[in-house]
């Protein structure tokens, strides 16, 4: 579903106008305006499961999916292809790194990402789910001291769409004892997301503390009130449409040319309940992502492999329609690529 809103159009017009202003500003006055520079104002945590970046998790293992035919845990892999595209912004100090003491910087980014997970246990190794997201993002960073920073991130509008794979759906439609008939639902929604960050240096190590949240636009919830291909309202819309999150990351202990890191992301996620009896409450559950590995130092360029790590997820299944699965786990080895 796509909710009508003028926010994206206004942001596009503002971005074009600011780029034109930057091009028309005399060179001596352009020190505080930047365009298409990837500045480190609010970098996603390594454990953030929704980050727009290039990440491959393989080899990996997963709990059985809700509609899998072959029972038991399975070998899987998942890939995220994405990027936060920097457009333009302002800064009080001409510096290509973090904001200095009592200095600030702000800008506009366009986050775009595409995610796929594949199951190798069921017949034909089906694509289980594909998700994509795009939107508009503003970031702000203020230097509290020479060694600490306040960061703010706001996504005023973004769209997320999720789709089960065709072969997964074919397998899900097979009858299996003790399982209800399969129904295909494609969650699709628009949302606002905010984040607040505190970062502090301890020698050469960096501690990051985060809080954020996602709230849906409109009253439709995460999915329509009807099945795909039908107009009959047979589904109960979601109502608990706010998802808070907390995160912490420690990055330091440099060994060779890379830093060690430990990153944790926690989200209070809604478990979908497509058919609820009158008065029946939806349930939310804490879901955890943990990443432990090594990464290149901040502002490093020309190194294709940015991170490698062990990744573990436990909680509500995060993949589209499969969020009806409350107790899900996934674990594997992750590899993040960049330039």
Regions found by a protein language model. Give the residues of each.
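Bacterial N-terminal signal peptides that target proteins for export
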Residues: 1-13
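N-terminal compositionally biased, intrinsically disordered segments and leader/signal-like regions
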Residues: 5-8, 26, 146
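Cleavable N-terminal signal peptides
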Residues: 16-17, 27
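N-terminal signal peptide c-region/cleavage motif recognized by signal peptidases
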Residues: 22-24
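Transmembrane beta-barrel domains of Gram-negative outer membranes and organellar outer membranes
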Residues: 30-142, 180
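Short loop/turn motifs that connect adjacent beta-strands in outer-membrane beta-barrel proteins
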Residues: 42-45, 87-108, 144-150, 199-208, ...
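Outer-membrane pore/translocation modules
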Residues: 99-250, 325-327
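Outer membrane beta-barrel transmembrane domains
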Residues: 215-339
């Amino acid at each position: 579903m796509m909710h009508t809103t003028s926010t994206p159009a206004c942001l596009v017009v503002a971005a074009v106008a600011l780029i034109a202003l930057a091009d028309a500003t005399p060179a001596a006055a352009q020190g505080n305006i930047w365009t298409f520079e990837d500045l480190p104002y609010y970098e996603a945590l390594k454990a953030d499961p929704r980050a727009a970046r290039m990440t491959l998790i393989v080899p990996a293992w997963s709990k059985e999916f809700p509609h899998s035919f072959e029972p038991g845990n399975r070998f899987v892999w998942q890939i995220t292809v994405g990027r936060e595209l920097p457009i333009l912004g302002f800064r009080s100090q001409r510096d290509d790194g973090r904001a200095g003491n009592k200095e600030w910087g702000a800008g506009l980014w366009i986050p775009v990402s595409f995610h796929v997970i594949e199951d190798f246990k069921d017949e034909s190794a089906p694509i289980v789910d594909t998700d994509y997201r795009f939107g508009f993002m503003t970031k702000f960073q203020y230097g509290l001291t020479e060694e600490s920073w306040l960061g703010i991130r706001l996504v005023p509008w973004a769209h997320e769409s999720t789709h089960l794979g065709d072969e997964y759906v074919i397998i899900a439609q097979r009858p299996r004892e003790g399982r209800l008939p399969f129904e295909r639902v494609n969650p699709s929604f628009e949302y606002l997301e905010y984040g607040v960050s505190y970062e502090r240096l301890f020698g050469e190590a960096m501690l990051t503390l985060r809080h954020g949240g996602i709230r849906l636009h409109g009253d439709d919830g995460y999915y329509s009130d009807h099945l795909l291909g039908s107009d009959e309202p047979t589904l109960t819309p979601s109502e608990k449409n706010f998802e808070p999150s907390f995160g912490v990351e420690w990055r330091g202990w440099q060994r060779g040319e890379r830093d060690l890191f430990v990153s944790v992301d926690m989200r209070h996620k809604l478990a979908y309940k497509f058919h609820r009896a009158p008065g029946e409450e939806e349930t939310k559950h804490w879901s955890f992502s943990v990443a432990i590995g090594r990464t290149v130092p901040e502002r490093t360029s020309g190194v294709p492999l940015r991170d490698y790590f062990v990744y573990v997820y436990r909680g509500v299944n995060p993949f589209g329609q499969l969020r009806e699965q409350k107790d899900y786990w996934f674990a594997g080895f992750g590899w993040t690529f960049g330039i």
